[in-house]
């Protein structure tokens, strides 16, 4: 009697293990936060997100409520996973040579500069909005990957790898921006502690120490020191990930084990919690014409216009100058469609918005801009790739610029 249900159960298991499943759960949790924030249970939702949770030994700058622990604590694991992914690609994947690194890196830099300039141009004359310039600079791989997988053969394996590498570089550049521009005032004794712990982690790597508790302990100490240093504490995930061994077969196995252990935690707990805690905002008083205000308009245009122009323009220019080559089986039309998808900014964009406009009335309009820009980028990118004529810029099977 239960046999007919076996295939369905198998499909569910595959879905839950896929990136699409994680993206769906993140979207579901985010929608739940938004719905609760605009329901009769809004007060309970706010009470939950601001529930006091403070440990005196962490000092004045330590997280003091549930939402802060998610953003400043658990999100450290997200940045750790980002670094682990790029390390795996560098060791044995699509970034294993300088030539392979160059193409997505150039696109990521272009996709960072142009959206930031677009935002600053739109918000010119609004000094209170200036700090949000970094909100539209990142691409969210959690949402772009399921879309390109759903498109099947319309996106070549080489183009898929390029987009994923670009999204990873985007996240890394976003981390650098957060560390440099969104920290607090510097406290030199804590910075010295950060340097010493980082040196110890590097020493452990150089000494080929494979004991994970050493890196885990170092990461926790680093996070604690970063709280008082003035740099953002999530930088601990970046530094710890960079210091994990990966130079030989045993190190690569260690890296794979850590990644396989932490990634599901980030996919199914950390990111959904982040979306649930940060997307919830009251829609009371919001009107469509509010999207024409400087902050949401700047973010929306930065994502849906600045991002594809920056990514596609920088990549195409580097190909024309013969600095890099297109991935095998990739056309310029396909490249443009993928550049449109790069405007899907969610996790990092929300993260930066919370830092840029913390305690400001601009946080809700900023989130509106993120949602609108990301949704429009997803729709335009999907439609372009789905309905683009197959004879538009025939792909080159060897890479390079199609002739």
From Swiss-Prot:
The chain crosses the membrane at residues 23-43, 66-86, 101-121, 132-152, 161-181, 184-204, 219-239, 257-277, 297-317, 333-353, 363-383. It is a multi-pass membrane protein. The keyword Transmembrane applies. It catalyses: Na(+)(in) + 2 H(+)(out) = Na(+)(out) + 2 H(+)(in). It is found in: Cell inner membrane. GO terms for biological process: regulation of pH. One of its GO terms (molecular function) is sodium:proton antiporter activity. Coiled coil: none annotated. Pfam families: Na_H_antiport_1. Keywords: Antiport, Cell inner membrane, Cell membrane, Ion transport, Membrane, Sodium, Sodium transport, Transmembrane, Transmembrane helix, Transport. The keyword Transport applies. InterPro entries: Na/H_antiporter_dom_sf (IPR023171), NhaA (IPR004670). GO terms for cellular component: plasma membrane. PANTHER family: NA(+)_H(+) ANTIPORTER NHAA, SODIUM ION/PROTON ANTIPORTER NHAA-RELATED. Belongs to the NhaA Na(+)/H(+) (TC 2.A.33) antiporter family. Na(+)/H(+) antiporter that extrudes sodium in exchange for external protons. This is Na(+)/H(+) antiporter NhaA.
């Amino acid at each position: 009697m239960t046999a007919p249900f076996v295939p369905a159960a198998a499909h569910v298991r595959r879905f839950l293990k896929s990136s699409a499943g994680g993206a769906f759960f993140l979207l579901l949790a985010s929608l739940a936060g938004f719905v609760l924030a605009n329901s009769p249970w809004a007060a309970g939702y706010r009470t939950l997100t601001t529930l006091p949770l403070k440990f005196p030994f962490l000092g004045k700058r330590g997280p003091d409520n549930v939402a802060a622990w998610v953003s400043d604590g658990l999100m450290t694991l997200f940045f750790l996973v980002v670094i682990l992914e790029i390390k795996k690609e560098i060791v044995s994947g699509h970034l294993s040579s300088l030539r392979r690194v160059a193409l997505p890196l150039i696109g990521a830099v272009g996709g960072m500069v142009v959206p930031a300039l677009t935002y600053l141009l739109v918000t010119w004359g609004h000094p209170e909005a200036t700090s949000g310039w970094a909100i539209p600079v990142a691409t969210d791989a959690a949402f772009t990957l399921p879309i390109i997988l759903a498109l099947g053969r319309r996106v070549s394996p080489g183009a898929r790898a390029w987009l994923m590498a670009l999204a990873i570089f985007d996240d890394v550049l976003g981390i650098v921006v957060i560390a440099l521009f969104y920290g607090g005032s510097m406290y030199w004794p804590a910075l010295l502690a950060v340097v010493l712990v980082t040196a110890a982690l590097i020493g452990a790597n150089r000494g080929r120490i494979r004991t994970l508790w050493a890196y885990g302990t170092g990461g926790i100490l680093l996070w604690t020191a970063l709280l008082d240093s003035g740099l953002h504490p999530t930088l601990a995930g970046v530094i710890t990930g960079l210091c994990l061994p990966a130079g030989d077969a045993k190190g690569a196995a260690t890296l794979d084990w850590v990644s396989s252990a932490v990634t599901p935690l980030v996919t199914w707990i950390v990111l959904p919690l982040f979306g649930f805690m940060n997307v919830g905002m009251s829609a009371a008083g919001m009107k469509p014409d509010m999207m024409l205000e400087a902050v949401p308009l700047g973010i929306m245009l930065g994502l849906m216009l600045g991002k594809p122009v920056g990514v596609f323009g920088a990549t195409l220019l580097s190909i024309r100058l013969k600095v890099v080559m297109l991935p095998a089986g990739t056309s310029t039309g396909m490249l443009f469609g993928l550049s449109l998808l790069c405007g899907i900014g969610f996790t990092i964009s929300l993260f930066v918005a919370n830092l840029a406009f913390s305690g400001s009335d601009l946080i809700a309009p900023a989130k509106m801009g993120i949602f609108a820009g990301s949704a429009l980028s997803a729709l335009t990118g999907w439609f372009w790739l789905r309905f683009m004529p197959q004879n538009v810029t025939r792909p080159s099977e060897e890479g390079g610029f199609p002739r």
